Each structure stands twice: as structure tokens, then as C-alpha cells.
């Protein structure tokens, strides 16, 4: 995916680096695969703010994405490439030969007209999905399941991927984008190839208004608050706030927050 840097004609254009969206071939979402999405403004059922700095933004329709890839043995053709406001990558609209339509995340290297297949065991071509036990070692994969049949959980955002580094009869070991090495069941599904739009990390909004279009409100710094509101607040004049901490007093730079008693820790080989 290509990005463009705008000329500094105005203040809002000076730092703007945005996507060109040249690849998109269909403007409106498929009606049978999209549903309405109600905005909460970060409030719960009693009207109290539970998620700060969230609200406003453009209306969105939620696209139903096929993360399970459980339509085995039936080939599909990539018919359209679409924008999805709910995620950082683009999505493909698939037409199966039996007439069904489904959305999947876009895969790097695929284009309109390519054929893909899901099965327990199939060829290692880009976009194909199969059990991890049948994927060769060293293969770049994405949309990895943690529980068989539940749908992809890992490596789903723009530019992300995992790598298969070891296999046994029951488990397979994968290296995640964070560098973590983790065991997953061999019967979990995974897609061959990495997620498209690796340039997403280079994008810059350039102005506050673009953040508001996306539904994100201004965030107040902790050091600008009073001591009653934040551990880093208060002090005479401008102060550093001391050791960086979040609103609950937990150190914010490099502090491990994962529960040490979590039962799934035994599947993590290296953090």
C-alpha cells in the first residue's frame, strides 16, 4: 500500500502522511455482510464514562469478517478490495463458487482475481488457510487461532505476521510480532502470508481534526492534572511528575502487568 506526504501549504498539511487508498475497488460495503454499529461515547448503561477520550467521529458500519476460515474445500475468488473503518488493514470480498460471499483481511501479495482455499491441508499459496500442523516450518503466517474453531486472535492488524518455528504432535511453536514465542494447538487454523498495509505505522494524522473524525478526543497529560486526579499531578510550576505511572499508580514504562498465576503462562516459552 502506498502513502503520500502532503506539501506544507497549511499547518494541518505540514506533518500529514496518509494512505492513498489506490487499491480500493468498491466504495460501499456488502449489505449482507455489514451491520449497524451504535456509538456509546465511552459511556456504560448508566451514562457514566468508563473509557475516557472516546466519542464523536464519523458513522461506521461493522463488517462481518470471516476469521474462522471454516468453509473447507470450496475455492473462492477475490472480487473486490474494500476499506474497513473498524481495522487498520483493508479487506477482501470473496466470491465462493457456490455463491456465498465473505470478507477476510487483506494479505500481502494478493490481488483481485486470485483464487484462495481453506482446508485441513492444502497448498502453501498466499491467502490459503489450513491447520498449523500441515504448514511447513519457517512459513510466514497470520490470523492465527488460539482455540481451534473459535476464530483468529493473533497477527490480525496491518503489516503483522507470525512465523512457525517448531512443531510436535499436539503443539506448534510460533514467533509473534512482539518477539514472544508461544505454543498453540496443531489443529488451530492459520493463513499463509502477512497482513497487508505494513506502511500503516508510518501514517501521521497531521491535525487534531483528523483524530476527531476517527472518534478520538483530546487526551489530558497526567502532569497537567491535580494530585487528586493522577499520581503524576500537582507540584510547583511545571514538574516532571516523578516516576512515570498510569492513573492507577502502576509504572508505565516496561512494567510487566500480566498475571503470574494465569494458567496459559505455561504455553509461553519466551516473553
From Swiss-Prot:
Q: Does the keyword RNA-binding apply?
A: yes
Q: Which SUPFAM superfamilies match?
A: Nucleic acid-binding proteins, Translation proteins SH3-like domain
Q: Where is this region: Disordered?
A: 221-271
Which GO cellular component does the record give, naming just one?
large ribosomal subunit
Q: What processes does the entry annotate via GO biological process terms?
A: cytoplasmic translation
InterPro entries per the UniProt record, alphabetical = NA-bd_OB-fold (IPR012340), Rib_uL2_dom2 (IPR014722), Ribosomal_uL2 (IPR002171), Ribosomal_uL2_bac/org-type (IPR005880), Ribosomal_uL2_C (IPR022669), Ribosomal_uL2_CS (IPR022671), Ribosomal_uL2_dom3 (IPR014726), Ribosomal_uL2_RNA-bd_dom (IPR022666)
Q: Which Gene Ontology MF annotations are present?
A: rRNA binding; structural constituent of ribosome; transferase activity
Report if keyword Translocase is assigned: no
Composition-biased stretches (Basic residues)? 257-271
User: PROSITE patterns this protein is in?
Assistant: RIBOSOMAL_L2 (PS00467)
Top-level taxon of the source organism: Bacteria
The SS bond pairs are none
Q: What does this protein do?
A: One of the primary rRNA binding proteins. Required for association of the 30S and 50S subunits to form the 70S ribosome, for tRNA binding and peptide bond formation. It has been suggested to have peptidyltransferase activity; this is somewhat controversial. Makes several contacts with the 16S rRNA in the 70S ribosome.
Q: Output the NCBIfam families linked to this UniProt entry.
A: rplB_bact
* Quaternary structure, from the entry: Part of the 50S ribosomal subunit. Forms a bridge to the 30S subunit in the 70S ribosome.
Which family does the record assign? Answer: Belongs to the universal ribosomal protein uL2 family.
| Protein name (Swiss-Prot/TrEMBL) | Large ribosomal subunit protein uL2
Source species, please?
Answer: Karelsulcia muelleri (strain GWSS) (Sulcia muelleri)
Give the gene that encodes this protein: rplB
Amino acid at each position: 500500500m502506498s502513502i503520500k506526504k502532503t506539501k506544507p501549504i497549511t499547518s494541518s498539511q505540514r506533518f500529514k502522511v496518509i494512505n492513498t487508498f489506490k487499491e480500493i475497488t468498491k466504495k460501499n460495503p456488502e449489505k449482507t455482510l455489514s451491520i449497524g454499529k451504535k456509538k456509546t461515547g465511552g459511556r456504560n448503561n448508566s451514562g457514566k464514562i468508563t473509557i475516557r477520550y472516546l466519542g464523536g467521529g464519523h458513522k461506521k458500519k461493522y463488517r462481518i469478517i470471516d476469521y474462522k476460515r471454516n468453509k473447507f474445500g470450496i475455492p473462492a475468488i477475490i472480487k473486490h478490495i474494500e476499506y474497513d473503518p473498524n481495522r487498520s488493514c483493508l479487506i477482501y470480498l470473496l466470491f465462493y463458487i457456490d455463491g456465498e460471499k465473505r470478507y477476510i483481511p487483506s494479505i500481502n501479495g494478493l490481488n483481485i482475481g486470485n483464487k484462495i482455499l481453506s482446508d485441513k491441508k492444502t497448498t502453501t499459496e498466499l491467502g490459503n488457510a489450513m491447520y498449523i500442523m500441515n504448514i511447513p516450518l519457517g512459513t510466514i503466517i497470520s490470523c492465527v487461532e488460539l482455540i481451534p474453531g473459535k476464530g483468529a486472535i493473533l497477527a490480525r492488524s496491518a503489516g503483522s505476521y507470525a512465523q512457525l518455528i517448531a512443531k510436535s504432535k499436539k503443539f506448534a511453536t510460533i514467533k509473534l510480532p512482539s518477539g514472544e514465542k508461544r505454543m498453540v494447538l496443531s489443529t488451530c487454523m492459520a493463513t499463509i502470508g502477512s497482513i497487508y498495509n505494513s506502511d500503516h505505522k508510518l501514517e501521521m494524522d497531521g491535525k487534531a481534526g483528523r483524530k476527531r473524525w476517527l472518534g478520538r478526543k483530546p487526551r489530558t497529560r497526567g502532569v497537567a492534572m491535580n494530585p487528586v486526579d493522577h499520581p503524576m499531578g500537582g507540584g510547583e510550576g511545571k514538574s516532571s511528575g516523578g516516576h512515570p505511572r498510569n492513573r492507577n499508580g502502576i509504572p508505565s514504562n516496561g512494567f510487566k502487568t500480566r498475571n503470574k498465576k494465569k494458567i496459559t503462562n505455561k504455553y509461553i516459552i519466551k516473553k
